[in-house]
Amino acid sequence: MVTGLSPLLFRKLSNPDIFAPTGKVKLQRQLSQDDCKLRRGSLASSLSGKQLLPLSSSVHSSVGQVTWQSTGEASNLVRMRNQSLGQSAPSLTAGLKELSLPRRGSFCRTSNRKSLIVTSSTSPTLPRPHSPLHGHTGNSPLDSPRNFSPNAPAHFSFVPARRTDGRRWSLASLPSSGYGTNTPSSTVSSSCSSQEKLHQLPFQPTADELHFLTKHFSTENVPDEEGRRSPRMRPRSRSLSPGRSPVSFDSEIIMMNHVYKERFPKATAQMEERPSLTFISSNTPDSVLPLADGALSFIHHQVIEMARDCLDKSRSGLITSHYFYELQENLEKLLQDAHERSESSDVAFVIQLVKKLMIIIARPARLLECLEFDPEEFYHLLEAAEGHAKEGHGIKCDIPRYIVSQLGLTRDPLEEMAQLSSYDSPDTPETDDSVEGRGVSQPSQKTPSEEDFETIKLISNGAYGAVFLVRHKSTRQRFAMKKINKQNLILRNQIQQAFVERDILTFAENPFVVSMFCSFETKRHLCMVMEYVEGGDCATLLKNIGALPVDMVRLYFAETVLALEYLHNYGIVHRDLKPDNLLITSMGHIKLTDFGLSKIGLMSLTTNLYEGHIEKDAREFLDKQVCGTPEYIAPEVILRQGYGKPVDWWAMGIILYEFLVGCVPFFGDTPEELFGQVISDEIVWPEGDDALPPDAQDLTSKLLHQNPLERLGTSSAYEVKQHPFFMGLDWTGLLRQKAEFIPQLESEDDTSYFDTRSERYHHVDSEDEEEVSEDGCLEIRQFSSCSPRFSKVYSSMERLSLLEERRTPPPTKRSLSEEKEDHSDGLAGLKGRDRSWVIGSPEILRKRLSVSESSHTESDSSPPMTVRHRCSGLPDGPHCPEETSSTPRKQQQEGIWVLIPPSGEGSSRPVPERPLERQLKLDEEPPGQSSRCCPALETRGRGTPQLAEEATAKAISDLAVRRARHRLLSGDSIEKRTTRPVNKVIKSASATALSLLIPSEHHACSPLASPMSPHSQSSNPSSRDSSPSRDFLPALGSLRPPIIIHRAGKKYGFTLRAIRVYMGDTDVYTVHHMVWHVEDGGPASEAGLRQGDLITHVNGEPVHGLVHTEVVELVLKSGNKVSISTTPLENTSIKVGPARKGSYKAKMARRSKRSKGKDGQESRKRSSLFRKITKQASLLHTSRSLSSLNRSLSSGESGPGSPTHSHSLSPRSPPQGYRVAPDAVHSVGGNSSQSSSPSSSVPSSPAGSGHTRPSSLHGLAPKLQRQYRSPRRKSAGSIPLSPLAHTPSPPATAASPQRSPSPLSGHGSQSFPTKLHLSPPLGRQLSRPKSAEPPRSPLLKRVQSAEKLAAALAAAEKKLAPSRKHSLDLPHGELKKELTPREASPLEVVGTRSVLSGKGPLPGKGVLQPAPSRALGTLRQDRAERRESLQKQEAIREVDSSEDDTDEEPENSQATQEPRLSPHPEASHNLLPKGSGEGTEEDTFLHRDLKKQGPVLSGLVTGATLGSPRVDVPGLSPRKVSRPQAFEEATNPLQVPSLSRSGPTSPTPSEGCWKAQHLHTQALTALCPSFSELTPTGCSAATSTSGKPGTWSWKFLIEGPDRASTNKTITRKGEPANSQDTNTTVPNLLKNLSPEEEKPQPPSVPGLTHPLLEVPSQNWPWESECEQMEKEEPSLSITEVPDSSGDRRQDIPCRAHPLSPETRPSLLWKSQELGGQQDHQDLALTSDELLKQT
């Protein structure tokens, strides 16, 4: 060993004990574990200096040698010391002179005395003792520096108290100036000022110490190369200023503090007495009234927290100049935030507060900096800088200047003072720019009050209050208003907590955190007005679909991590994280809300990343409160040990587990039992097929570590972000990622995604309640505040009105002036061509166009500089640290709507686009117009045709705009499309923020746009994802104004080509057309057509699905001028890949042409979420990865369930004209609710009934779930997933590309009952009573008594009326178009009558109302009523049919057209008694794997017939009645079952059906021109002859029987249909049918369309009932279902589809047309009627 070495040498090494055997063992073990984790790139910061050991004198090197050898060959320490550590950072070799300049922050410069450079390289003298600590034996208090407690937890106690060297340290050696001015060679240099290296790692760290060291000294700035958890130390400091080292916490710091205190007692007193006695005590938030401005109040909290922390550190001897630097930096940042986020007079108070604190710390900071100055290090750095510069490594400026900047001397303090003072002066650019705006806003900036808002409805209830959807009366924006009962707060002594929530919400500026607009008090309530996030919360999503797909979990969790990181950086501990508080925006992203239990602690300081502080931080709050939601409470809270930020990471672990598994890991019948599990139990992990991915399980288990200090995330969110689970995730582009679940809203007031929780909480708003006495709670009066976001609303309104008066004579128009271009510093000049489009009213722009962009990049650094920049009048103030806050604010106040195309890199320089040709104009809504409908798009300006007819008002709804805006985020650089029309883009004030382009194409309706009202202040655009693929369905309507090409001579100057676009992994493809070549200088080139763009429309006619010749024909028909709408291919979800090997097997999904038709559905509401789900049920494919959908169901082909297809044109949904393949319309599992959860049979659209939350959300306890948490995971049944939500399982090759497989096949853990609700996507009838829980088995259903059914029916009828409203009404024309392709295939509306019947087209209407089956008596009455309505309808139909011919998409009025559905007699017979899987739930979704499922609906009628995703009401017996009838009809070739019958049909029509079909082909054709395409060619010949179901391929489903079916009796345009659809064989379902069913089944009738997936099909004992029905009403079995108006005339053909006793209205019935022209065209037409009509 080295024992012979003199103590002196050891002194150099700092701690001789290291060679003791125990130390060696410890180090070996610890280092072997952590060796790989050490950061290679950070010099002194990874084992700061210890292993760098640049001993240059011979003595040093010999010592080093001995040391290294002495530890033994195997020692890891030796290996670490020997390895060259400076790979990424400059490498420090053994010679000091080669010390190259480390990257900023990577070298411990602060008290650099801590490195092991024990003596100067040139000095022959031996080093002096390192510090007084060396001589300290720990025996005499006098010997030890004040406050030195090596074992105190507050710092690393790595240096043992015992030192071998007994010399005392004399302060006499300290240079009096505090600056070490001696040269390195000077023997006089003081050991403290020149050679002392303040932070070196202990030489004998314990395992825990090393663990913490490696685990916690990490920064978010340096990404971990290997993506692992990053325990390696990373450079933390973000500045090159002197003396700022990342890891200054060693006993050496204490020594330095000791020296400092001994030397400068007055400065010490100033630090420790003055702040504690005066500053903190007099300014603490508890001692002063809360500031009225929430943001300032938050900043006030932070300033006091910083003062407290500074005091604690000073008393503990842990302050360093680096700490002061960071403190100052944070104070400056808070000041900046104060200026940016508040216009309140209280800003002066905060400025004063900050100045006081800065003055307090100024002198100590400077003195410490002097003490810590290390001339030797300075010279080393100088040499390194010279070498670095010589090597051309980027130091371009002259070296002296570089050195000066390294020293932090470049800042001119006078200049900074001037800037500070200028904040208050009237002549700042900010005030100058916004003087006018402020003048305008001052008068209007009245204090908000309850009278300013009108309450629309209750969103949800909570323990303390309720949240309401409200609309601001003047701006018409929607907000969520949280009303908290003051009396409750006072009684619980939680008033302060309400202020904390207000402050956090007001201050937070992050795209993943809900923002607040204003707060005020009423007599009984404190009200907070926040942005309304439409998509509900994750808890509801979990209840409805069970465990989420891993990709979806990754996105949601990552976004929550960013939100949490942001909060923690600002010292906010949420304390109540749970899925209920994670809201889903209209774009499918996450926003964190509910800060009612949050605490505000200290902002993150990198200097606090040391063990002691991390421990302290983890125990930051010692209030002993156990608060939060029991399942998510961390062990340390339960044990009342003190807690801090780690509690949020624990909750994140629970949330992650819940997302992945579907239930929480710990549960109990009582909180005590639950807590016992949390503290002691092991986590149970799913096994087998349900096993979680290893990385997900690993992340969850690390987050759920019992010890908060070892919990992942405790040191920083960075280590969570580096976990392999997020490998490959782009943290800065999360908002640009496609969300898998996109809420589909039927109107701007749709709150169906929220659970009102009325049964759990009821807050009575009794007006007679006594006013709360406010004596003793004066602070409540300070609650009213108005955030800059909200005040901007008023100012921009004023500005808009001024501009309006100035510019637009017509009172109804407001033009968005661009006059302020010059003002936009950070906004590139408005040079992008703006596509003018008219949108509802000025506020829309304000809201819509505001881009709250998040610079996620910032989220990586300690408190993210305001992460969201809003421009253009969004009520959110611009918070752009990078830019003077003035610009954005100025613009917002002035109401300037600046849309600027960001340049590719996001810089704000103007883009070289043509000057604006048009003005962006807002059309004001006529007073009477429902705010929901935005005026139709008009493109004003030369050369742009009016899109008004094409895009209905809704089309342009703000959502479309928002989406468009976001889509841009996806980074198409402007250069890529400069020549392409681009809307002016709103650019965030900060150049670094994400830039959004709004290509004009987006303005037209975006198929996916959900029906948000233009006025809705829906979730900030920041939450919108700009994923190009989602919004641009390949086939989606052109969102930018069409390009008009004027033919020159005989040429247009471009070539187009048809391309195959395959649906996911299937062999089914659709034909799209792209611009293959554009001649330079030709007419097309001049018009702006670009090569490689996808053509969506020609002359307003969608070309998706048309063959090449048809498109050419369209072009040529247009004469000398052709209008072509295109979208860049990269904006679609079409992916380019190698040619398919089996292309010869591929089948083309074609769609019938349909005219754009009117969108007429403006007044239609989409049904509630669950109904939506029904539409999308099929989309809920649980398969975990979406990868299989290579095309990721572009909206154009999005599954029927996809919003694109929902035909209920919600105000927002694009006009049908833009809608993509109608086929998509049928969402097979209309009910995407397929609940993945075991109790999936929940009614899929509980929401339908009166907006209550998806029914069954709370009611049924899924099997998976323990009772304790039962309310959470209910059947997944009601929430529609976005088309992308579940990737279809690859095996389902036949799966129709249009629908993503239902989740059924998905997670094993929650078997999805096969009863997928197949409701027509359109039919939202699922308004089944929430309580109704489908019987678990077909048997039960059978057994259920008629009485129960009758009762259920009555209830259902009540509910139906409202649900009816929501039914999606598709104009028949449209339906026809959409349905035609599929219509051919019988809709297999399981359990619902498929609306295939002629009326079926009412799909738009087809709200499958799972009316509980009715008793026969009821049925009879219904029939009578139906007959009456039939007669009326026939009359209407005649009118409508003529309309249909002209208008294929007439707004639903074409009920008469419905017959076109009937063309599928096969469909009707397909209704197969099997009940079409009805037995199970007619709502069953088609399985992804068709083969397993059995026949799939061939060419499902576009959802028209899909029965409402009918959720069986527990009391309902299977629909016994109508089925036999329908079946018989189907079997009887002569009898054309009423066309309207939309019962599920087996994929292959029976012979009878075929005959019937042929009989009516002509009539149908006349009625529905597209009928020919629909003809049920899909029935395979074989099936027709054999009684067994023929094979139906998904293709058939997708394309409609005409294409898919082998027979293709009538393919569109006479094209032969592919017989290949037989790929998927439909299992014989007959065996599933009850004997009665089998009997009626004609030989040709294929098995049920839907094989019951995993649920045995129910055999319905409906024969007798059906027979009765037939007897009563042989020709039409239609059940009337009350429509929204209460009229029960919903015609549902009984026979074709088996109706369960609860007759379900067929999808066909259309809700009354907008115009009300069509009252009830829902009746299914019998063949006779069809003939009459024709």
From Swiss-Prot:
Residues 815-834, 1356-1381, 1420-1440, 1685-1694 have a biased composition (Basic and acidic residues). Residues 1042-1130 form the PDZ domain. Residues 453-726 form the Protein kinase domain. It is found in: Membrane; Cytoplasm, Cytoskeleton; Cell junction. InterPro entries: AGC-kinase_C (IPR000961), Kinase-like_dom_sf (IPR011009), MAST (IPR037711), MAST_pre-PK_dom (IPR015022), MAST_pre-PK_dom_sf (IPR023142), PDZ (IPR001478), PDZ_6 (IPR041489), PDZ_sf (IPR036034). GO terms for biological process: protein phosphorylation; regulation of interleukin-12 production; spermatid differentiation. The modification Phosphoserine is found at residues 6, 14, 88, 91, 149, 230, 815, 817, 836, 841, 970, 1194, 1275, 1302, 1385, 1711. It catalyses: L-seryl-[protein] + ATP = O-phospho-L-seryl-[protein] + ADP + H(+); L-threonyl-[protein] + ATP = O-phospho-L-threonyl-[protein] + ADP + H(+). Residues 112-197, 216-246, 421-451, 802-834, 849-895, 919-947, 1005-1032, 1133-1484, 1501-1553, 1606-1734 are annotated as: Disordered. ATP binds at I459, S460, N461, G462, A463, Y464, G465, A466, V467, K482. The active site is at D576. Belongs to the protein kinase superfamily. AGC Ser/Thr protein kinase family. This is Microtubule-associated serine/threonine-protein kinase 2. It comes from Mus musculus. The gene is Mast2.
